[in-house]
């Protein structure tokens, strides 16, 4: 009995220690297919390597939040950091700018990463 209680206490201490680890998110913005002006595509924002799990992600068109944005389920890696994919359909052209804005406890404020159509 004592052994199982001790193991439970150790497990709780270990799990509570995981909460103290904070990792800033890595942000990648890319299109599903090579961009062609006037042709429908998908804009993706892959956010990875962050901890804790609470995070805000917005896809932007000319600085404004885009509608109909979907996302994957929150998942975690072997190192217990989290990752997500946000995506939406869009039609690129020469005049519009697209970006992904992320806010997380590890950041001093929201971080915006622009989509580079040449990547």
Curated annotation (Swiss-Prot):
Compartments it resides in: Secreted
Disulfide cross-links: 45-100
Signal peptide region: 1-20
All copies of domain Ig-like C1-type, residue ranges: 25-114
Source species, domain of life: Eukaryota
Keyword vocabulary terms for this entry: Disulfide bond, Immunity, Immunoglobulin domain, MHC I, Secreted, Signal
Gene Ontology cellular-component annotations: extracellular region; MHC class I protein complex
Gene3D superfamilies: Immunoglobulins
A biological process from GO: antigen processing and presentation of peptide antigen via MHC class I
SUPFAM superfamilies registered for this protein in UniProt: Immunoglobulin (SSF48726)
PANTHER family: BETA-2-MICROGLOBULIN, MHC CLASS II-RELATED
Subunit relationships: Heterodimer of an alpha chain and a beta chain. Beta-2-microglobulin is the beta-chain of major histocompatibility complex class I molecules.
Family: Belongs to the beta-2-microglobulin family.
Functional description taken from the UniProt entry: Component of the class I major histocompatibility complex (MHC). Involved in the presentation of peptide antigens to the immune system.
Name of the protein this chain belongs to: Beta-2-microglobulin
Lineage: Eukaryota, Metazoa, Chordata, Craniata, Vertebrata
């Amino acid at each position: 009995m004592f052994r199982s209680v001790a193991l439970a206490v150790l497990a709780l201490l270990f799990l509570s220690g995981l909460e103290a680890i904070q990792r800033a998110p890595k942000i990648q913005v890319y299109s599903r297919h090579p961009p062609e002006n006037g042709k429908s595509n998908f804009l993706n924002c892959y956010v990875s390597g962050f901890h804790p799990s609470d995070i805000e992600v917005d896809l932007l068109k000319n600085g404004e939040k885009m509608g109909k944005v979907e996302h994957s389920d929150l998942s975690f890696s072997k190192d217990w950091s989290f990752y997500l994919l946000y995506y939406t359909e869009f039609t690129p052209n020469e005049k519009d700018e697209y970006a992904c804005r992320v806010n997380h406890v590890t950041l001093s404020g929201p971080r915006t990463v622009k989509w580079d159509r040449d990547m």
